[in-house]
């Protein structure tokens, strides 16, 4: 009986000395900044004259001149930034958009790699000097019969920051 009383006394003693402590939580909420490509202006890529027989997926390559800007210098390494390009895909190349000439398209590449349409490309959100080099490359279907004519194509390049 004495053991039971001593055990109860120890438990009661521990409960009698309990204390409450307050906890304070604080921090800063940040939203990703609004970003734009080339200040919202249309990016022009001029191919000039292309020799039809030389179009091979490498010939006529042109750099796509673009700039990324954000309305804040706040960058968080956990935020993800992506580039995506959209347009009407050719039937013969999933990284090329149709032009107004059947069987002829424009492929976009990033750093020498095919940039598939509607596929986000992760980019460095904290250092825009490391943005991917984009190049447009004329491509044609293997069975295309092209003739002398002007051509044009339209696509959208989008930056997302989350």
Curated annotation (Swiss-Prot):
Gene coding for it: yfcQ
Record family assignment: Belongs to the fimbrial protein family.
Protein name: Uncharacterized fimbrial-like protein YfcQ
General function of this protein: Part of the yfcOPQRSUV fimbrial operon. Could contribute to adhesion to various surfaces in specific environmental niches. Increases adhesion to eukaryotic T24 bladder epithelial cells in the absence of fim genes.
UniProt cross-references to Pfam families, sorted A to Z: Fimbrial
Description of the deletion phenotype: Deletion of the operon under classical laboratory conditions does not result in any major effect on E.coli capacity to form biofilms compared with the wild-type strain.
Single biological process term from Gene Ontology: cell adhesion
Database matches in Gene3D superfamilies: Fimbrial-type adhesion domain
Cross-referenced SUPFAM superfamilies: Bacterial adhesins (SSF49401)
GO CC annotations on file: pilus
Swiss-Prot/TrEMBL keywords: Signal
Residues annotated as signal peptide: 1-18
Other remarks in the entry: The operon is cryptic under classical laboratory conditions, but is functional when constitutively expressed.
Keyword Signal appears in the UniProt entry: yes
Cross-referenced InterPro entries: Adhesion_dom_fimbrial (IPR000259), Adhesion_dom_fimbrial_sf (IPR036937), Adhesion_dom_sf (IPR008966), Bact_Fimbrial_Adh_Pro (IPR050263)
Induction: Expression is negatively regulated by H-NS and subjected to cAMP receptor protein (CRP)-mediated catabolite repression.
């Amino acid at each position: 009986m004495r053991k039971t009383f001593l055990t109860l006394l120890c438990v009661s003693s521990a409960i009698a000395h309990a204390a409450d402590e307050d906890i304070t939580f604080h921090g800063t909420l940040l939203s990703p900044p609004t970003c734009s490509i080339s200040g919202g202006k249309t990016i022009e890529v001029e191919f000039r004259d292309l020799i039809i027989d030389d179009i091979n997926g490498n010939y006529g390559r042109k750099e796509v001149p673009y700039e990324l800007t954000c309305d804040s210098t706040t960058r968080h390494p956990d935020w993800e930034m992506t580039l995506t390009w959209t347009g009407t895909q050719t039937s013969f190349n999933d990284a090329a958009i149709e032009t107004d000439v059947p069987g002829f398209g424009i492929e976009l590449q990033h750093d020498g790699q095919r940039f598939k349409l509607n596929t986000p490309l992760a980019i460095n959100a904290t250092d825009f000097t490391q943005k991917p080099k984009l190049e447009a490359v004329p491509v044609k279907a293997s069975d295309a019969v092209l003739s002398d004519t002007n051509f044009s194509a339209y696509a959208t390049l989008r930056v997302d920051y989350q």
